[in-house]
Amino acid sequence: KRFWPADVHLVGKEIVRFHSIIWPIMLMSLGIELPKKIYGHGWLIVDGEKMSKSKGNVVDPIPLLQEFGSDAIRYYLLNDIQLGQDGNFSRERLINRINSDLSNDLGNLLHRSLSMVEKYRNGVLVHGDASVDPCIGEVSSEVEKNAEATLQRFRNGMDNWKINDALKAVWIFIRSLNKYIDVTMPWVLAKDEAKRAALDAVLYHLCEGMRFVSLMVEPVIPIAAEKIWAQLGLVDFEKANYENLVWGGIADGTKVAKGMPIFPRIEVEKEDLKAKVKSERKFNVKKTENDTSVPLI
């Protein structure tokens, strides 16, 4: 009952015929409700070639999960591969994606934001008043508009199974928040007591923006999303979701709790990278006429 009836029945493209004709007939004969939609996904290929046991290029996911974690693997696959299309897996691209998107963009934004809240406001958030500085007020208003617009683009992408487009929209917003820090320069505002309310507003906008981000990325990187939520000083993560997300959810007086980096940067030498790729490929057996490609599951 937890998994069926299904809104979407996701299958590999090579078995779409069975699951769209034979499977529904079997369900109907048993009086079981049919899925609302059947979606055939593509294959996962490696360096331009289909994964196959005979070629010995099947990548074992277990070592990858142990090394990088499920969040990073899930993000890479869903961001870099359009659902429904064949997608290329590359360990080098995986590491680059972790370092650029997850560590630099997302992780660095969270760390910078919370560090400034702790340094300048003893870890306590208040709404503040961006209007005391016209420039701060203008860019802060843009952050709010961008948050709402990003949420709508994210919803559209998820509803239409364009998960990579949904994630790209979120990362555009994340990068805009990093730019917001550079434009508003909280370290300068902190030196002027007359700009205290503006500083409070900037720090609040950063953390509220991160609250939006945490709920939008939760379907893809749930472990990291919950860590972000907790570091923002928020509770009841399991009750929150992006469907009813509106700006201004962080209450005045919320105390942040900066923690360890959610995605530490990965440093790997090229030669080590090549060795790792080779060691993670298994099933290196002689090619046979019954060679079958391994679909992305």
Language model features: what each stretch is:
Residues 42-132, 235-270:
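Catalytic adenosine-cofactor/nucleotide-binding cores of aminoacyl-tRNA synthetases and other
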Residues 57, 87, 146-150, 209:
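N-terminal alpha-helical segment
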Residues 156, 161, 171-297:
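Basic, alpha-helical terminal appendages of large translation-related enzymes
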Residues 110-154, 174-195, 199:
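Conserved, charged catalytic cores of large soluble enzymes
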Residues 1-75, 92-116, 200-218, 229-230:
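Structured ligand/cofactor/substrate-binding pocket environments in proteins
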Residues 10, 88-102, 149-168:
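Extended, non-catalytic structural segments that build the interaction scaffolds
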Residues 29-33, 115-126, 161-163, 219-223:
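Surface-exposed helix-capping loop/turn segments at secondary-structure junctions
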Residues 41, 79-80, 169, 173, ...:
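Short acidic/histidine-centered micro-motifs embedded in hydrophobic/aromatic stretches
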